[in-house]
Every structure is written in C-alpha cells, then in structure tokens.
Amino acid sequence: MANRMSMFSVGSEGPGNQRAGGPQTAQVSTTTLLNAIHNIYLASQPHQLESSTSLVVNTWLTAAQGNPTVDSTLSSKAWEHARRRAEDGCVILGSLHQSTPSVLTPFLTSFPFAIPSTLYKALDAVQPFLRCVTPYNPSTPRQAALGVTLTLNLTGNLTAASLALSQGGIDTVNGLLNIPSEAGYRAFDVFYYLLTSASTPAEREFLGLQTPSSYTLLSRSGTYDPPSYLPTADDGASADDFRQALKDIGIKGSAHRNFISTLAGLLKLGNTLDYGVESEALEEICEDVSGLLGIEPDTLLRQCSTEDRWTFIGGLYESLVDWVISKANEAIAAQMIRIRNGDESPDGRGVITPTSDQASGDTVSITVMEVPQITLGKALSMRSIFDDSQGINAEMIEDGVNVSPAGSSVLREMQQAVSDVGPDLGIMTGPEGRERQHELEKREVVLEKIAYAAEEGGFLRKLLFPIEGEGINLGRAGRFDLPAVLGSNRLWYHLSLHPTDDSPAQLAALPSITSAWSAGTVSRQLRSWRLPEWANRRNRNLDFTADFDIDEFASRYAVLGCKDGKDGIESWVLERGWSNGEVFVGKDRVWMREGAWWEAESMLDLKPEHNDMNIPAVNINPFGSGFDTGYSANGSGYFPPQGIEPSFNGSNEQLMHSRNFSQSQVTVGQQNPHAPPSIAPTAMRNVSNGDYGLGNKGDTYKDDIYYNPEGDFTGTMDPELAKNKKLQTKEVSFGRRVWVGFVWALTFWLPSPLLQHVGRMRRPDVRMAWREKLVLVFLIFLINAIIVFWIIWFGRLLCPNFDKAWSQNEVKTHQGEDDFWVSHYGKVYDITKFWRQQHSDTDVKTTTENMLPLAGFNLDNYIFPPLNEVCQGLGIAETTRLIFNETAEFSTAVHTSGFYGNPTSKLHDPLWYWNVFEPKIKEYYKGDLVWSEKDVQSQGNNMQRPWAIYGNQIFDLTDYFKTKDVYKDAAMYNFLDESVSDIFKNNPGQNVKSLLDQVIQNSVGNETQHAKVMNSWLCVQRNFYKGITDFRDSPRCTVNNWILLAFTIIICAVILVKFVAALRFSSKRRPSPQDKFVICQVPAYTEGEESLRKALDSLTALQYDNKRKLICVICDGVIVGQGNDRPTPKIVLDILGVDPKVDPPALPFKSVGPGSEQLNYGKVYSGLYEYEGNVVPYLVVVKVGKESEQGKTKPGNRGKRDSQILLMSFLNRVHHRAPMNPLELEMFHQINNIIGVDPELYEYMLMVDADTSVSEDSLNRLVSACANNAKIAGICGETSLENDEKSWTTMIQVYEYFISHHLAKAFESLFGSVTCLPGCFTMYRLRTVDKGKPLLISDAVIKEYAVCDVDTLHQKNLLSLGEDRYLTTLMTKHFPYMSYKFIGDAQCKTAAPESWSVLLSQRRRWINSTIHNLVELMRLKEMCGFCCFSMRFVVFIDLFGTIILPATCVYLGYLIYRVASHTGQFPIISIAMLAAVYGLQALVFILKRQWQHIGWMIIYIIAFPIYSFVLPIYSFWNQDNFSWGNTRVVIGEKGNKQVVAVDDEGFDPRSVPLQRWDDYALANNLPGRRGGYQEKHDYGYPDQYEMDEIKSVYSAAPQGSVLTGMGGRNTYMPPQSPAPFSNMNSAPTMQGQYHDAPASIRRQSMMSLGTQMQDMHRSQSPYQDFPTNRGSVMNLRGQGSMTPSLGMAGNRASSAIGFTGGHRPPMGPDAMQSTTSFDFQRGHVGADDAAIVEAIQSVLHEIDLDTVTKKQVRALVEQRLQTELTGERRTFMDRQIDRELENM
C-alpha cells in the first residue's frame, strides 16, 4: 500500500482543536505587523502573513552562524497542493532589503522529499557567477531571477530537477563592466576565484593571470579581498570549493580549460574599455585575448569599437553562465536517472531500491524562484496580489467571488513598480521596453559578428551558437519566461526582511545574532511592499488556496457526503459549518480557503474506502474531527482567534495597549429579540459579509423592511413617505426687501420671459438669483471702475495736462539712448527717434559720443534763430547777436544760422530756423517746460536774475542784459524799449503782467512808441521764452494726489505692520505639554485613501497625551470619490481597522437641509487606532441617509456644514444636559462608556480636513496658546502645500499660502481679529474658562450656522461655499471681545488643487464667500469703532481688496504700459510701493530662512493676472452656479412675504425623538447618570465639570467601560434606539456585534477568549443570540406598554468602583441581582428595598464617616442606584441609613 501519510499534516503547527476559520476580520496595521515581525525575529521563526505568504527576517550573521530562518510549512503547503491538486506551483523567494542573504538553498532543504545532491553542487557552481561583494551585502545576487524547477509525480516524489535563469538575465553592468568606484564593491566572485585557483604554474602562465589590480574591470573600486568581518571568508578556499563543484557537474578536462580561458579572456579584454589606452597596448591586449578566445585579433581590434567590446564582454559572460547551467542540468538529470534505477541515493552516498513509479506518469512541478531584485520582486508580487485584471484574481471575479478592489494608492504604487521593471515582466511597450529591446538587438548584432569570425568548432562559437542553425539566442534558450511561469502556477511567497540598515560590518560587533533591530527600517520595508494591505486584502477576499470545477469538487468529496451540482455542494458546505466564507461556490468553480481545504483533505484521508484514490492519507487523531489542521480558527497563522485577552493592568486610564481594537471587540449586545425590528433603512443594516453594513458602493438597496411583526409602521407619521405639496409664506426682513427692490430697479429691463426661454432659467428663484448676481457684478464692476477711474483718469479731469509738463530736472532723467529728451525755448521734446540720424550737412558727424552728452539738456544756447529775424522792427543788424550767460559746453552742437552760419551749409540761410528746424522739432513735442513759481521768485530775489512771469509764462532776459553789460550799452545792443526791459530788470521773479499791460496801454497814444513797445514785447516772447509756471503744484492738481497719498500711507503702514507682525510671530518656543481634552474633528467626503491615511496618522502621531484627544471622523454620506474604488466611509473604517462585519444600527438625527432632508440617519463606530506606538480613541459617524436616498449616488450627504453642526449640536446638548436624539445618545454612549471619557471634559475642537496632515507639535502649540490667553476663542496655524511642485497650478499657490499666513493672518492676529479661521486646520474653544459659557457650541452660533432653508444667493454663498469664513464671522459677531489668533509655529500640510478646473472651483468658493462675508462684517456693531479707528475696520479694508483685485490688475497693467511706452512721467511712488511690498515680503523670507519662497514669489508675480483678474472675474460671474434642488422653490417675493412652493413631505420633528441621557441610561441599564443642567449648578458645579462615579476613566473613580477588562462582570449595552422606532433590532447573526441577549446571559467579556472556549458547549460565539423575557423599554413618546420582567435575574450595571482593580468586593451576597423592578402600585420602575440596603451598605463601607454628611451619603446612594428616590423610597432610604449607622 502506498504511503498515505501527509508530511504536511504531521508537521503542522499552531493550536489544535480549532476549526478552520473564514475570512480574517482583524485589520492588520503596520504596527501590529511590525510587532509580530520583531517577535518572530527574536525567536528565529517565520511569520505567516496569510495562507500563501510567509515572512522571515535574516542577516548574513544568522545565515553564517546558523541556518537562516525559512518557513518549512510553506514548502510543505506547496508540495501538498502540487501532489493533491495536480497543479504546478511556484514559490517566490523575494527580498525586501538589499542586505538580506539568499535563502534558496535552505528553502530547498525544507521540502518534505529528498533533493539530489547534484542540485546543491550545481548551485555552488553557478552562484559565484551571479554574486558579488558590496558594502551592504557580502553576497549580492545580480540576476533578475534564478529558478529551481522540481518535477514531482502525483505521489509527491521528485522525478526531475533543473536550474534556469529568467530571460531578464544578469546585471553585468553593475557586476562586471562598471562596478561602482566606491570601496567595498567587487565584481562577480568567479573572477577572484579564477585568479587564486590556478592549479599549476603552467596553467597560470598559459592564462597570463596577474593580480586583480591589473584588470580594469576589477580595479575600479580598489577592493580585491572579501570582507574582513566574515570570519571564514577566503577567496582561496572558496576557489577550491568552486573548482570542485565544477568537476562535480562535469566541467573538467578540456571543458574546464576552455572555461577558464574564456574567463581570463574576458578579464583581459576589459582592459580595452579604457578610452585612454594607447594603440600599441590595445593591439597587444587583443593579441592575447584572441589566443584565449580563439578569434582573430583584427576582429576585436578593428571590426569592433570600444562600445562593441563592452557589449561583447557582457553577452559572452551571460553565454558562459548559460553554458555552466546547462552542464549542471545535465549532471542533475544523470543523477536522477541513477536514483530512479536504484544505482544511487539522492544524497549520492550509495545504492537504494529502485522506485516503483515511473517518470513517464503524470507529473507536476514546483518552481522555487529566487528574485533578489527588490524592484522586480515588489512588482511581480504586488501585481499578482492587487491586480484584478489578470491571473487568479481575474478568474475569481469572473466566477463571482466578491473581491473588493485594492485602494487607489496601492494600485498606483503597483503600476509604478510594474512600469519600473516592465521588460523583466515581458512588457516591452514603454520606454524601458523599447530601450531593452534596442540593447538586445545591438547585443545580438555584435555577438553574431564575432561568432561568425570565431574558429569553426571552437568553444567560443559553441557558446554563442549553442544550438546549431538557430543563430544567437542568448536570453531565450535554456531560460524561463517569467510572466509565463507566474501566470501558469499557483503562487506562494516567501519574503525576506532585514532588521536594520546597519552595514554588515556593524552587525559583526553585536552581542548576539538577533541584536540588530530598527523598527523604522523594517516598517519601511513593510510599507514599501504594502504588506498590511496585502494581508488585509488576501485574508478578507482572496485567501483561496484551492479551487475546483463543480463536478470535480462533487466527485472528490462524494465519499464525505457531497452531492452533485451546485445545490448539493452548497448544502454539504453548510453541513460542514463553512458558512463564514471558508468556501465559495461560484458560477463554474468552488473556491476554498486553506483551513477548509485541509480539513476536507484530512477527512478524506481518514476514509478507508478512499484508498483507491492516489492521494496520501494522514495520521490524524480521529477525535479531532478534522480540526487539528495547524491553522488558527480564523484561517490565519498569525491573527489570533476571535476574542482578545482583557487587560488587568489596573490603570486608571485603561486605554488598551492592544492595537486597533475596534468597536467590534468592545461593544456588547443591544436589544430584545422580541422587540420589533428597526425601521432604519435596510441598506444601512446590510448583513452581507465584511461590508460594515454600508452596502456596496453606497447604493445597495434591499427591499426587506419590517416595521413591526405585522408589517405596520410603529409611529404616527413617516416623513419619508408623505408626499405633501403646499405653499408656504415666509416673513422677509426689511434688509431683504430693500435689496430685492434695488435688484428689480436695476434689472427691470430684463423681462422674466426672456430669462426663462432664452436663458433657460425656468425657476423663479434661479432667475432672481441671476438678477442678484448681475447686480452684484455690476456693483463690483462699478467699484472697480471707480477705483481705476479715480486713480488714472480723475486726476486728468482736474488737471488735464499734468502729464504734459516737465521740469528741467525731470527732463534730465531722460538721458538714455532709447530715452533721449531735451528742452528748448520752454518746450520739451523727445528726440529718441531723431538723434541717431545724420542731420548735419557739415563735416560734423552724428555719433553717440557727440549726441549722448546732450541728452536731458536745455538747448537754448545751442540752437537759436538770427536775432535780426526774430526781433524784426527794432532795427537790429544781421551781424548783431547776443552773448549767452551760460557758455555752450559742446561747441560742435551749436547751430548758428544766418550771417554767422557756415557758408557751405544750409545754416547760412537766415530762415533755416523757421523753415527747417521748427517744422522738424515739432514732430517730437512732448509738452511744456515748467518752473516752480517759488524757484522763479527765489532766483529773482536772491540772485537778481532778470526773469519774470507774465500770466503763467516765464521770460528770461539774462542774456540781453549780459550783452548790454559787455558792450557798455552800445546802441546796437540796446534794441529793446527801455519801458519794457526795465520792468524785467526792476521786478525780477515777479509776475509783471499788470505792469507790462500798463506800459502797452500807455503807449497806445504814441504810434511810434507803441510800435517799438509792441515789437520789443514780441521780441521778448519769441527769443526770451523759458516756459511756464508749474501748474501741477496747484490745489486743483494736487488734491487727488494728496488723497491717494493718504491711502498710500495707510496701505504702507498696514504693510509695515504686517511685516512686523510676521516677525513677531516667528518665535519657535517649545511649550510645555498640555493636558486639555481635545476633539479632533475630521469631516470626510470624497478624499482618497492616501489622504485619509495621512490625516488620521498625523492626528494619531501628534505629540499630545493620547488619552486626552479623540479623533472624530464624520463621513458626509456614502459616496465613492473620484479615483476611489469604494465609498469614503469604507476607506475610513478600513484604515482604522474596524471589523467589516460590524453593522451598528442606523439612528435618526436632524441634519441641516431643506424639508425632509433634515431627517437623516447615521451609524456610529468607535475603537482605538494605533500608529507608530500611539493608541488614540476614535469615533466615526457615517451619515447614511434615509431609505429613499439609498438608490441615489450620495445617500446621507448634507455638506460639510452639517458635519460640523452634528458635532457642535451634540456638544451643546452635552453641555446643557439637554435631551438628545438617538444618534447623539449613541455617540454619548460610545464616548462615555466605551472610550471612557465624559464628553463634557472636552474643551477644544480641532477641525482638520481629511486631506490635511498635521505636524506633530501643532496641537500642543495651539492648546498652549489658548491656555496662556483665556480670551482666545479660535486659533489657527500655518497651512503649507505638500504638492507644491505637482503642476503649474500648485506652483503658483505656494507663495500665496505662505504670505497669506505670515503677513495677512499674522497682521490680523496681532489685533485678535483673524477673519477666516480655515476649516482645514483650526481649533476652537468650546466654552469660556472663567464661567464655562459656551462659545463654539453656544445656542446663538449653532442657530445661525444651522440655517436649513438656504434659498437666496447671499445665503448660498455664505453657507454653501464659505462655511469656514462664515463660522468665524459668527464667532466674531456673538463674541466680539474674544480673540481669534494665528500662530505660525503650528503647521500642517494640505493638497492644493492640481488642475485648473479644481483651482477655479476652489477660488470661486473662496472669493465669493469673502464678498458675501463682507456684508455680514459690515453689520457688526463693533466694526468701525470711534471715527473708524478700529483694527477690525482696518481688517475690513484689507478684505475689501478682494473686490478691487481686477482694478489692481488693470492699474498695474496701466503702469507697465506707461513705463514701457514712455507716455508719461515715471511713476516713482507706485513703483516704490510695489518694491516695498515685495521687498518686505522677500525680507520676511530671508529672516525666516525660507529661501525657496523668493523663487515662488517670482512665480506668483508672473501669475498675478490669474489671481487678480481671471479668478475674480470668473468667480464674480459664477456666484449663482449652484445646485438649487427641487424641494423648495421660491416662486415670488412681494412686500414682506416670500412665497415658497414645497414639493416635499416636509420634516416632522417627531421623527427624531429626544431623550435625556439619564432617562435613556436608566431605561437601558447603562451607567453614567449626569443630572439636569440646573442640578449641575445647584450641586456646586458652576465652574467645573461634574465627574460622577463612572463617567470617565480620568475621574477619581475608575470608569465602567468594557475597555477596563473586567472579565465577565461588567458588560454594558450600547444605547437602544428610542421611539418612534421602539427598539431598533439587529438581525441575528453569528458574527455581528449587536445582539439581543440580556445582560444576565452576556456575563462573559467580549474580550475574553478563554471564557468563550470554556463555554463552547453553551455558545460557539460571544455574539450568540438568546431568547429572553426582557420587556421592551418604554418609548420616548409615551406609547406602548411596559412589560414587567417577571422572574428575570438581570445583570445590574455595575459600578466601576465595585469591579475595577479590586477597590471593593462585589455589592452584597449576589452581585448579579437586579436593582430594578416594576412597582405595580406606584406605577414606575424603581429600586427595591434589597437594592437600597445593598447600596447603602456599600457606600458606608467606602466613605470616611468623619468628613461626609448624611446628605452626601444620600446622594452617593442614589448615584449608585442610578435613580432618584422620592416619596416612600426616600423615607425608606433615610431610615435605613440611620439604622446602618447605628449598627456600625
């Protein structure tokens, strides 16, 4: 009889007596995996990641000093599956670190069958060709993949074996041709063995071997010896072993000589690769090599270039390795024949009995594939695990297996990994593939050229042409196709990790071989290969290791009772108890997990009648019932069985030290199985496996609702089903009426039919919003137009020619080659286009040297008319000319015309000035030359300069009087009438208009005199004109400038203060650790897994007391975001590690929305999340929506504002001890009783967006700032970009983000008036410090922030777009004397929009919300202060800049045009302001050492038109771009009434019942009575928080949470959903956490596996449902009857004082006795006498009677009983207290 023993079953490991489990439900995190890896490393054991994957940790030290760790179980699995299933298998030996040693040989030895010794010798011979020494690994493999194929028959015996490289070949570049030049690197080991293993001197002489330093290929790094830290490393000894291995595989004699000759030839040929080698040396080398290789020297010397020789060396080396492998395979095959014939044993030591089986029978193969390259191993592994488009994953999906797609970030990383090594995976389409193809083709050409030139029949030709007639087939023949192997085998993974990044030399100094450990290094390896996601995905969906055809399955297991067909198989599977996903019956195949498969195979082996099947049996204990499988109950070798040992550490904080324990382990059952099932949407109570009850992609809807056993709805009204349609009339405020009237006044000319039919605006409210938008855009345009008009054109109206006048100094500023201005006779000219022209007909050339000195000059003394021509009628001779007071500096520039002109030129013409010069110069006229009237007067008075003003014209007679003085008043030079000249002489600098007019008037009677006076005056006007007075100094021209200057000063002052503020807030003081309780709110919408994980991990890793922070994630609907593969809530729950089977009830609450949308449902999850050693409690609220929403794409979605209100309203009700809705009651229960913190302890709320990661010290800095300043109500930190270089849209935002914080917000914060605390990173104070007055959670803020009917344009922009800014505005409005701060030390990173469309959408929201918030800011009473001297008013002005951004851009464009076109004066002030603005900002960067932002500033300046013009214009016009909905349509506004058509059933507040926590806790036997709000203050708690007996783990008394680990003594029920839904019952399930067993039956702890196993006869699961007589709790609306629990011994809700850490013994003789019963006479539930006595005795034993009053004792007793005693009960209590005191 054939041996039927299963080696695998005998050798199985793990706990026995456990049934093979279904899908793994525990979530694997990096930390849990890291801890497991550390433990197995210390124990030198493997770790099973999932059924087909094992992890080991090895170093060269563990490999050298002992056998490296391998998983023999994995090899046994592969063997069992191969022989039993007759399917090929492949074990991938992957390496996650470059320093991991090879485990190929040790893994082969772990197979449960004999391996022929020749195979090991073959590996010894081949590995020196593939490995080399590197600084990080003394034996680094350089091949892509090396496979050992073991061929087995179906009995599991080895029939053949072979070695092969993959077609990816060997990395000859890094291993030979171009080894790194750093110390520690060597080439392939074989070359060093060659140089030290020559057996005889003759052989060494023949080969011409020298020292390694003589060879270019070996000398690059300067390292020639093996590492010194290897105690037994010696090239000589290794070379001897290598030579012996070659002999063992048949390489000896001539084959060996050819082999070593080729190796030596390659070494020498490497010396030709140096481009600096001389020609003679090159010839000599080629001569030597040709003799060794058997080829003509000219072939290498002349037919091959240096590049060709490079290619030839690499190709020939690979060919040589292929030849060695082929010889090895021949030797292995020969030994296998000898073994089969009985001539030899597998170990080669002797003969054995010949085997009876034949090799010609059916066979299977197991390929052990070593993949040392990290990139390749990662790519092929992740592809097979996460890629659902191919391989077995695709087969599963096609067959109907429910496979959840991998996360988008995982898929992106997988795709990147595959693209990096595409050619090795057969992907030749990308750039890497094309490059590889080019290299292969080039190699083939070179090798073929040399092969044909080689000796016929020589060794070289045989190497290159191994198969005659096929040419060069290197890389194909004798190698395996890696993608084909992966696609045709069942894959198993054996992955090696390395414990540290330390060098191997450092490991040698360690005290033990397992001392090396770096959590960061190992964690990086785990995260790089996505092993946590790997484990979660495989264990949850894909961990099927066996699959059968339907008929095959039925046939194989027919002997075990399996029937034919799918129905028969499914029935048999259920009979076996495989109902939890262990077996899946698909369309065509049956899929089995490892535990179930092995259980079936074990049972099959036990069947005697099954002996005819050729399957080995196993020796299993018949009493084990097939459970002794070596697998844990859940089918995983790593994950612990369900249930977790409780913690008895006695800590008063009691946060578990376990990892990622979700609500599934810590929340107990709920309600009565006889209570009516929930009305909550069935899709929200989806019991499908592993779906969190959230449905598939957020839209699964199962029509199976039952309201009560009869199918009737239990309430009086269903707001979801009612279809009321009605008109509502709504009061409109006076302000709204004024605005509507104003809008119609401006848009009356646009008839509504035109908008309705042409504009396609069918709804009246949409048309009204469009009109409002049009008016707003018009007003904004008007404001911008006014600003632009005021700055640019208003001054022109007041002073039309102000830009056509220049002073002499201003003219002098134009002295460039392209800016050539001059003045002449009171006029200014721009002769830039003229001065280069050759305009002289004399020998004087127009050159730059001649002309440029005149730029900016006054040319009165250079170009002047003949005196007799310009002053006619005065008898001036043509020879008369004036002597100029200022001598011309450049004589070549003097243009003297007339009599003294050059006779040979046109200047000799007396009329040249008027005929030639004047017409030409007028073409370049710019304006008047102006003189300050003060300067004219000053020079006239002080210097006696004879010039004067006539009207506004200035005339200077200095040259006239100088000439007279020189010529002693000669008559020919005294040509002006003395009455005229004397006026200028006697009144220098004065306005002589009246005097001169008087002289003219007096001369009228004397014709001769009048003629001379008039001719003299005309001469003065034509020859002595200097310009005009500077009118720009007049009030008319300066008033506008003064106004602008005033605003400029204000702006500059603000900029300066901003600068100072930025410097002021640059301190980096490290505050002391804070201890305030903080809620970290994270609203999640459509973010991706990567963003969510970053956000949650960053919050968990905050350097803050983990017990005092709570992560509260609010998922805004069940929505699949763009790029995601599953809804956002599922992503969040996956990250947090929540059990996918957890399906809490959907509880109603009131949302922010119109009409019936106010009714919403939510689910609450809680637990602990661990990241990098930080364990933080979390609360997840998923808004799942109403029943009617489940078919929609966004069920439950109400917006971010609703998510904020949900938490704010909850905390408001907690603060006021007000009645709560069912969802809030559940939240309170989870926080208070499960997490163990009284919600009222939380003092701050940190709001963080789901795509934001917070720096570690940020929270502590924010809390510290608030603790130091009690006036701070809100505070934010700096938000920077994490994707700053992702695209051009992100690059233009970097500078803006930085400067908006360090200038804008720092400036606002200086005065405590930050106007927008960003929702992505802001912390609010919940209540004031002194009196506990609510702030963020105040009624006023919540009321205004929670407006439901958002039906106007203003409200839409406030509440739908800018909720963060509006919330800040509301806080400022209601708490104006509180501060709103910014601190730059608290930092976070967020993802900016990476595309233009997203940036447009974001800025539309920001800009429009800013505009509409300005309206709200204007209404604040404290806005302007006294005479507008208020910093908030200054902040308002700063924000006003948003509206005038387009005007700013237009003005800057205008400035650029003016400067570029030289059409006006240079705007010095404007340019100086801009320089100051950006200069100060750059100075901020420099002082803060943020050098990179200077570059970002330049990018921002380039993109300034986008920010200041494009985005604002787009935003302004899209103010009405909303989804308006159809439930509420405003059909008209008249007077103070607004008419609304409601096509909606409306919202009935009764659909969301409210109940005080105390009542709810009492009714449901829950701990934590709080008392009312008044009671809170009456008992003396006005300024502090009440901390009763079990409210918090931080109170004096330990809390009563199930997290405390109290065994089975104290389990609490989660809140029952109140009326009108009665008890929202969970459907019975074996796995769900919500069940209906009463407390008396649920005594065992959810955390205790031991109790579960002991009570296995009673219950297979701690979640088992038991019937009970417990009555339903009275609903909140007083409906229904109260059923007494007759004869029920219910478990009382025990006090933490009584059951934690041994503080006191159980209360009374029976701690499980009920404390409540129904009193038929009094008609209410109360404590009976026994319970009161017990409570009194308990309290009196614990208190100090010397310090406690009787009143306090009474209060403690009532607190212990969790009820208030009145009437007879109170009298009994008082009497009993007295009696007990007497007896003490």
Swiss-Prot record:
Q: Which Pfam families match?
A: Chitin_synth_2, Cyt-b5, DEK_C
Q: Which SUPFAM superfamilies match?
A: Cytochrome b5-like heme/steroid binding domain, DEK C-terminal domain, Nucleotide-diphospho-sugar transferases, P-loop containing nucleoside triphosphate hydrolases
Q: Where in the cell is it found?
A: Cell membrane
The EC number(s) attached to this protein equal 2.4.1.16
Q: Name one GO molecular function term.
A: ATP binding
Concerning its family, UniProt says: Belongs to the chitin synthase family. Class VII subfamily.
Give the InterPro entries listed for this entry. Chitin_synth, Cyt_B5-like_heme/steroid-bd, Cyt_B5-like_heme/steroid_sf, DEK_C, Myosin_head_motor_dom-like, Nucleotide-diphossugar_trans, P-loop_NTPase
Q: Where is the DEK-C domain?
A: 1726-1782
- Free-text function comment from the UniProt entry: Polymerizes chitin, a structural polymer of the cell wall and septum, by transferring the sugar moiety of UDP-GlcNAc to the non-reducing end of the growing chitin polymer. Contributes to the production of conidia and the ability of fungal conidia to germinate. Involved in the fungal cell wall integrity and the ability of conidia to withstand biophysical pressure. Required for appressorium formation and evasion of insect cellular and/or humoral defenses, promoting the fungal dimorphic transition to the production of hyphal bodies that occurs within hosts, and ultimately to virulence.
Q: Which keywords belong to this entry?
A: Cell membrane, Glycoprotein, Glycosyltransferase, Membrane, Transferase, Transmembrane, Transmembrane helix, Virulence
Origin superkingdom? Eukaryota
Q: Name one GO cellular component term.
A: plasma membrane
Tell me what gene encodes this: ChsVII
Stretches that traverse the bilayer: 738-758, 774-794, 1043-1063, 1433-1453, 1466-1486, 1494-1514
Q: Where is this region: Disordered?
A: 1-25
Glycosylated residue positions: 153, 157, 634, 649, 660, 686, 885, 1006, 1408, 1521
User: Null-mutant phenotype, please?
Assistant: Results in cell wall fragility and shows high sensitivity to Congo red and calcofluor white. Leads also to high sensitivities to heat and UV-B stress. Impairs appressorium formation, affects growth of in insecta produced hyphal bodies, and alters the surface properties of conidia and hyphal bodies, resulting in defects in the ability of the mutant strains to evade insect immune responses.
What reactions does this protein catalyze? [(1->4)-N-acetyl-beta-D-glucosaminyl](n) + UDP-N-acetyl-alpha-D-glucosamine = [(1->4)-N-acetyl-beta-D-glucosaminyl](n+1) + UDP + H(+)
Record carries keyword DNA-binding: no
State the name under which the record lists this protein. Answer: Chitin synthase VII
Any one of the GO BP annotations: chitin biosynthetic process
- So which tissues is this one expressed in? Highly expressed in hyphal bodies, conidia and during appressorium formation.
Query: What is the predominant subcellular site recorded for this chain?
Result: membrane
Its membrane topology is listed as: Multi-pass membrane protein
The broad enzyme category this protein falls into is: transferase
